[in-house]
Amino acid sequence: MSFEVFEKLESKVQQAIDTITLLQMEIEELKDKNNTLSQEVQAASGNHESLVRENQQLKEEQHVWQDRLRALLGKMEEV
């Protein structure tokens, strides 16, 4: 009788070990995925900052051209 109990216990311990092993593998995969996503976020953040700067520069250029155009139109009206 005690041998059967021992076998059941051994089986449950083995199942627990297998489950722990699978969970450890899953944790490693998730860590790798997390690292990859972190790198993607950093790259996207850098791209965002670059686009914000470019957008600001383009807005400034647009204002300069608008001012030039207004000045030119003003001169044309004078003539």
Swiss-Prot record:
**Superkingdom of source:** Bacteria
Sorted alphabetically, which InterPro entries does this protein's record hold? Cell_div_ZapB (IPR009252)
* Coiled coil as UniProt keyword: yes
Q: Which residues form a coiled coil?
A: 4-78
The entry's cellular-component GO terms read: cytoplasm
Main subcellular location: cytoplasm
Q: Where in the cell is it found?
A: Cytoplasm
One of the GO biological process terms: FtsZ-dependent cytokinesis
Keyword vocabulary terms for this entry: Cell cycle, Cell division, Coiled coil, Cytoplasm, Septation
Instruction: Look up keyword Coiled coil and say if it applies.
Output: yes
Q: What does this protein do?
A: Non-essential, abundant cell division factor that is required for proper Z-ring formation. It is recruited early to the divisome by direct interaction with FtsZ, stimulating Z-ring assembly and thereby promoting cell division earlier in the cell cycle. Its recruitment to the Z-ring requires functional FtsA or ZipA.
Q: Which family does it belong to?
A: Belongs to the ZapB family.
Quaternary organization: Homodimer. The ends of the coiled-coil dimer bind to each other, forming polymers. Interacts with FtsZ.
Q: What is this protein called?
A: Cell division protein ZapB
Organism (species) = Serratia proteamaculans (strain 568)
